[in-house]
């Protein structure tokens, strides 16, 4: 489902889902109870408290033998070490800044933040990283199209077209990637060392 999320949800979206593991590769997604989700579906609106954010950046290089479980465990272990055992992620929004992770890795990382007890997560990227992520997702969809998996409504081709439109918006400056305000305040800031 991640590939579809890469193309159907843009980086400005706010998503409400009925699962604590509701995460998207772009935008910010909140897990909520069924009543809150029902109200959101019925009215298009929802009221919920927005928690503080924790800014997470990465330095170093991910080793070829590492996968995202290693990154998740390293992130959690280093965070606990740096904050004297306090889980600063619990109940907060993790704002993932790409740093040295490539776009696809960073967007995948946000999906794992539920394991860190975060309320939500969002990936902050620059224009080039966001375009790279959209291009990766497009190529995966094109493989499905080439294998004859599109339907008579050309839903898969529509996803490719949507990605092309978003790429055009980014390149033209019409709708830049979501980025925090220059004076954004955080509960904490934390850098993960991948070395």
Regions found by a protein language model. Name each.
Residues 1-195:
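Fe-S-dependent hydro-lyases/dehydratases of central metabolism
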């Amino acid at each position: 489902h991640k590939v579809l999320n890469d193309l159907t949800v843009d980086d400005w979206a706010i998503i409400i889902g009925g699962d604590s593991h509701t995460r998207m590769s772009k935008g910010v997604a909140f897990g909520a109870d069924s009543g809150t989700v029902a109200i959101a579906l019925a009215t298009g609106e929802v009221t919920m408290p927005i928690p503080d954010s924790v800014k997470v950046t990465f330095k170093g290089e991910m080793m070829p033998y590492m996968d995202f479980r290693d990154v998740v465990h390293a992130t959690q272990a280093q965070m606990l070490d740096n904050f004297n055992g306090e889980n600063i992620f619990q109940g907060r929004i993790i704002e993932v800044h790409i740093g040295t992770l490539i776009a696809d890795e960073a967007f995948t990382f946000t999906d794992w933040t539920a394991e860190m007890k975060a309320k939500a997560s969002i990936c902050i990227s620059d224009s080039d990283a966001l375009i790279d992520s959209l291009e990766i997702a497009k190529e995966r969809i094109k493989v499905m199209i080439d294998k004859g998996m599109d339907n008579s409504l050309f839903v898969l081709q529509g996803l490719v077209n949507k990605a092309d439109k978003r790429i055009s918006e980014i390149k033209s400056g019409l709708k830049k990637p979501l980025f925090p305000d220059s004076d954004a305040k955080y509960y904490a800031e934390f850098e993960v060392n991948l070395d």
